[in-house]
Amino acid sequence: MLKKVIGILVIIAIISVGFFQKEAWLDAIKAGGMFSVLFSMLLIAADVFFPIVPFALIAALNGAVFGTANGIWITLTGSMLGTILLFFLARYSFRDWARKKVQAYPAIQSYEASFNKNAFTAVLLGRLIPVIPSLVMNVICGLSQVRWHVFFFASLIGKIPNIVVVTIAGANFTSNKLLSISIYGTYILIIMLVIYKKFPHLLKVPKK
């Protein structure tokens, strides 16, 4: 019971602060400096739980304020903070409730079976290809038998290409929208072709 209460309070705090203070947070990030780095990481972490601000906007803002290289590691750090926190909340605070919800959707249970069978590859490819929403993947992995360190490193590696592409594409969006769309579209196309050629079985949902 205590774990559930703590989990609920954490989620409410993250969403409330992020939602009601998002404009102030964005202004703080634009100001630059050490505190703006912290604000950016916390806002991205909150965004994992609830899309307070479009992820691409935060990534682009980080690139513009801190530079592409710094923007990438700041965005990645914030994203991983939110990701691992949600994973642990799903595993230890809301496991029973979330399990009942997942059981109502056979397709999601099939994906969970894939995570249990080949955890690192499944999580890695799930990050590279956003077939499953990130929030849903975090919860499913928290409910599954995936070890936290496997989930962490697979997510870390899998998030890097997307964050790099989104940061670069987002930073150029105002000056060249076509270029930004082309960069991200090409990235998605390449990944899809790799999966189709090398891992076609991972595109199929197992039948019961």
From Swiss-Prot:
One GO CC annotation: plasma membrane
Any Pfam family matching the protein: VTT_dom
Transmembrane segments: 5-25, 41-61, 69-89, 123-143, 150-170, 176-196
Entry protein name: Uncharacterized protein YqeD
Family annotation (PANTHER family): GOLGI APPARATUS MEMBRANE PROTEIN TVP38-RELATED
Membrane topology of this protein: Multi-pass membrane protein
Keywords in alphabetical order: Cell membrane, Membrane, Transmembrane, Transmembrane helix
Disulfide bonds: none
Entry superkingdom: Bacteria
Primary location group: membrane
Origin organism lineage: Bacteria, Bacillati, Bacillota, Bacilli, Bacillales
Localisation: Cell membrane
